[in-house]
Amino acid sequence: MSYIKSNLELYQQYTAMAPKLLARISKLLMICQNAGISVPKGIRNIFEFTWEELISDPSVPTPSDILGLEVSFGAPLVVLMEPTFVQVPTLKKPLPPPPPAPPRPVLLATTGAAKRSTLSPTMARQVRTHQETLNRFQQQSIHLLTELLRLKMKAMVESMSVGANPLDITRRFVEASQLLHLNAKEMAFNCLISTAGRSGYSSGQLWKESLANMSAIGVNSPYQLIYHSSTACLSFSLSAGKEAKKKIGKSRTTEDVSMPPLHRGVGTPANSLEFSDPCPEAREKLQELCRHIEAERATWKGRNISYPMILRNYKAKMPSHLMLARKGDSQTPGLHYPPTAGAQTLSPTSHPSSANHHFSQHCQEGKAPKKAFKFHYTFYDGSSFVYYPSGNVAVCQIPTCCRGRTITCLFNDIPGFSLLALFNTEGQGCVHYNLKTSCPYVLILDEEGGTTNDQQGYVVHKWSWTSRTETLLSLEYKVNEEMKLKVLGQDSITVTFTSLNETVTLTVSANNCPHGMAYDKRLNRRISNMDDKVYKMSRALAEIKKRFQKTVTQFINSILLAAGLFTIEYPTKKEEEEFVRFKMRSRTHPERLPKLSLYSGESLLRSQSGHLESSIAETLKDEPESAPVSPVRKTTKIHTKAKVTSRGKAREGRSPTRWAALPSDCPLVLRKLMLKEDTRAGCKCLVKAPLVSDVELERFLLAPRDPSQVLVFGIISSQNYTSTGQLQWLLNTLYNHQQRGRGSPCIQCRYDSYRLLQYDLDSPLQEDPPLMVKKNSVVQGMILMFAGGKLIFGGRVLNGYGLSKQNLLKQIFRSQQDYKMGYFLPDDYKFSVPNSVLSLEDSESVKKAESEDIQGSSSSLALEDYVEKELSLEAEKTREPEVELHPLSRDSKITSWKKQASKK
């Protein structure tokens, strides 16, 4: 068999040989004790290897001078040096001179270069190498034993000075050794193997001596390996538990118990020795952990809460696929059991077969017991964990104030802790689909109720905890193959886990909480939610109240207007002209100017009915003279708020710029005045556009008002609603939008750019035939536009297109521009009713108008640019000897009417 072995085989062999080497070292120490050398409680790192050398990765095999080994620690080259020792700090007295010891030879550290030497074919060379190594080992061991004996004496003296038990020092070494990581111990064992294997003992003696002391080696045995982080060294300690038990009952002094014969002969005083703690970091960490444990224990004792621990494992035999999944965990060597290689360990060919047989038996005796598979674990603080057979966590419950209020998490059986469900202390939470779906949540529970969704996200069921019609009776959902969720109510939610004939049921909702906070907090949350709803309802109620007060105020103002109890102060003529001049300078369109609104408290002074009847004649006489036909635009819209004054003050001093509402503002009031009826009811034109009859039509058209205001008349028929229903709806909709928030629309719309009116052909107040039919030959569905008492437009097609809000607004603005340019129709102009064929010239003009309309914006905000283009076109047309008008055709889309200048 070749001496060159793989790295894995060497690693397994070193792991198996570690107990044997420790047994051999212990035997060597016993020999030293029998020879008169005191046995210390710990041995410093004999060969002074650094920590980096001990923990280096032996993954890359390199040739070695040891027969049958191939290993490398990866440590850097180390020069020849003497072993250095840690200086013990002095407290009060200086240290005594060290006892006589054999001269310290220079220790040749094994380097990587030395280990890479080739194997010698002759056995003589191997024997010489082994003998030299043994000599260096013996010389160094004697010196290190003496040094550690002196440290042990210091520890014993210090323990007596503070009144501690001398055995505590030994216990510290034993406890501190358990903190050493298993990999570090294995690497340290390998280091010891690489050095101790060079001794002069034969292979047969090595196996026999190791077998004789095999049972005494282990973590719980007196031999412990300790790493000192402060000095970066390893220590091999003997606890000597049997000797300590014998010396407890004796009344010998501390010097008799721990002073070796060698130091007694020298006469070193015990009180002059000082001790340095070999593991201060470990001791501080242990003390910190103990303090934390005691604090937690005191806290739980103060709460008087202590729950029994439940450590429940799977009883059934694990399936083969689960055993394969957990094979890595079962093969991992534990801290309290030595590694067991068993038959996997390969030994050199020179070893006898009987030794291998005995070694395998000892390894089987020290083998760890079969690892149990956890099922349900509960701890003192109330936390609970349920595990899958694979070892993954299935259910995790963490208590908050007590065990009755927990946070529950459900996980899938994969290593990545895939969350399936989450519930808070109140039982509110969500459950995810186990598979990838469009909607991740299958169940959602909140304080109001719950919902269940399908994979597409549609709500399948929805219920409320407090509703009488949507109360949940029971709900069971299989979260996965092992877990099932059962919901019987807001306070009854459980999770059942079943696997391998083992079942456990955990409560998710809050129950039996001794603190009594669950219901209060839930009630507070419900109250807070109710407060939010009440707050929203209060805001809505306040808004309704505000609107109601505004409506009532408008109603009261209407009554006051009818009674003539208040008057309104309008701006003077000078202020009005300045305001108009400023607006003309800024080139602001009249439609974009703010409209005058009459808020609560603003009213007008209306004369009594007798006074109005007596003065109506004079008013009507002045109306024709005050109706200008000038194309100059007069912008009289103001933004100044009106001031309310009492009736008495108005009578005492009435300024010429203060006037009451004219009777011509409202057609209804004007009609009642002309028919000598009671006008105290006032204007009622709040919802629909005012209806004008033949009684007041002529006087209403000639009443004094802003010349630029366009009066839009919609010709309707109350007996034929089908033909004029769309027109009525359009006029009423636009009228409501224009007069929104106004208490007296007919009075407050005096300064608007246009005003909407209706003319009913079938009204009983109309003449036979109606005045507009007799004068202009109008029909149902037409729209007439007047400005300054002159007819500007008439037809069914607006702005070249059909009947719509945008087209109506565009046609109104075009009529305003036509009036400013001086284009109007005669007062007695009659629209042709029969169908007519458009001439070629008329069709071209229609196409031109349509193309221009298409290029314009449909928005009312862009009408200004469109009107400017029309003005430029109209200015060119004024140079021609004829005037273009915009009348109506009944059946065709557009009918153009032209009149010669001489005829005009």
Curated annotation (Swiss-Prot):
Pfam families noted in UniProt: FAM194
Q: Where in the cell is it found?
A: Membrane
Q: Does the keyword Lyase apply?
A: no
Q: Which domain of life is it from?
A: Eukaryota
InterPro entries noted in UniProt: FAM194_C (IPR029281)
Q: Which residues cross the membrane?
A: 778-798
Keywords in alphabetical order = Membrane, Transmembrane, Transmembrane helix
Where composition is biased (Polar residues), the residues are: 342-360
Ranges for region Disordered:
247-275, 328-360
> In what way does this protein cross or attach to the membrane?
Single-pass membrane protein
Q: What is this protein called?
A: Uncharacterized protein C3orf20
Naming one, the record's GO cellular component terms include: cytoplasm
